[in-house]
Curated annotation (Swiss-Prot):
GO terms for molecular function: G protein-coupled receptor activity; olfactory receptor activity. It comes from the Eukaryota. The lineage of its organism: Eukaryota, Metazoa, Chordata, Craniata, Vertebrata. Residues 1-25, 76-99, 161-197, 259-271 are extracellular. This is Olfactory receptor 10A3. GO terms for biological process: detection of chemical stimulus involved in sensory perception of smell; sensory perception of smell. Odorant receptor. It is a multi-pass membrane protein. Disulfide bonds join 97-189.
């Protein structure tokens, strides 16, 4: 591709919240704390599951993969946001913007499918406990995880390559916190109708279909919970399901609002706030919701902490 014939833009400017300079320092502090807590929470989960052989079962190995995705997702996005918030104008090269968009789509797409696989795993465990070892054997688990990662790679490769094959004639100011498809697409000086059809169809398949499957799985799970004889058990199960559904609704709902119609009528500031839900909040909440409330995870964490204290004592 001859870049000079197709595009005169060699770098982009990320504007961030430049319309609200008085808020940027406070936002920098909040985002930094969220980033550190996200990394720590997901790192703890990764270490706990990796070191405890008894947790090497599909349920926890799915969590391990989710934690890797969340750490990677945050590492691709948040440092750039912090730079944007700490400077008046942040420059990012054409190649740098391409790379960031690619990895955002890779990890975001992988998470969409991975959360669906995790919901299926919980559905099989709760609704078909006797057949669970057969339904979710190691082979099925590996296929679901590999499918999630390969799907994420394919989504990222197709969408990013397509977006950056368009000509960019200027202006080069991206009114966003990072290089994401919708705000970058607004700078394209060509007809993007076919891409928008692809984006609409792709979002339905990648975001809406897994989300609907998750909802159906949890409806079946809720019916199974209602049959539990123990009131305490029902309350605990309902609480867990409610927190899981809150997390997936936040993630899929906001991602759907962003990607279903890339050139939607939302204001730039609204788009930024929506994007923060699935780029900042869900990576922060998922460790708390999926893992740190889990009794087995907490027991393992306490054991590791005690072992560390004993080693330091001697």
């Amino acid at each position: 591709m001859k870049r000079q014939n197709q595009s005169c833009v060699v770098e982009f400017i990320l504007l961030g919240f430049s319309n609200f300079p008085e808020l940027q320092v406070q936002l920098f502090g909040v985002f930094l704390v969220i980033y550190v807590v996200t990394l720590m929470g997901n790192a703890i989960i990764t270490v706990i599951i990796s070191l405890n052989q008894s947790l090497h079962v599909p349920m926890y190995l799915f969590l391990l993969n989710l934690s890797v995705v969340e750490v990677s997702f945050s590492a691709v996005i948040t440092p750039e946001m912090l730079v944007v918030l700490s400077t008046e104008k942040t420059m990012i090269s054409f190649v740098g913007c391409f790379a960031q968009m690619y990895f955002i789509l890779l990890f975001g797409g992988t998470e969409c499918f991975l959360l669906g696989a995790m919901a299926y795993d919980r559905f099989a465990a709760i609704c078909h406990p006797l057949n669970y070892p057969v339904i979710m054997n190691r082979g099925v688990f590996m296929k679901l995880v590999i499918f999630s990662w390969i799907s994420g790679i394919m989504v990222a490769t197709v969408q990013t390559t397509w977006v950056f094959s368009f000509p960019f004639c200027g202006p080069n100011e991206i009114n966003h916190l990072f290089c994401e498809t919708p705000p970058v697409l607004e700078l394209v000086c060509a007809d993007t109708f076919l891409f928008e059809i692809y984006a609409f169809t792709g979002t339905i398949l990648i975001v809406m279909v897994p989300f609907l499957l998750i909802l159906l799985s949890y409806i079946r799970v809720l019916f199974a919970i209602l049959k539990m004889p123990s009131t305490t058990g029902r309350q605990k199960a309902f609480s867990t399901c409610a927190s899981h559904l809150t997390s997936v609704t936040l993630f899929y709902g906001t991602a759907n609002m962003t990607y279903l119609q890339p050139k939607s009528g939302y204001s730039p500031e609204t788009k930024k706030l929506i994007s923060l839900a699935y780029t900042l909040l869900t990576p922060l909440l998922n460790p708390l919701i999926y893992s740190l409330r889990n009794s087995e995870m907490k027991r393992t964490l306490i054991k590791l902490w005690r072992r560390k204290v004993i080693l330091h004592t001697f």
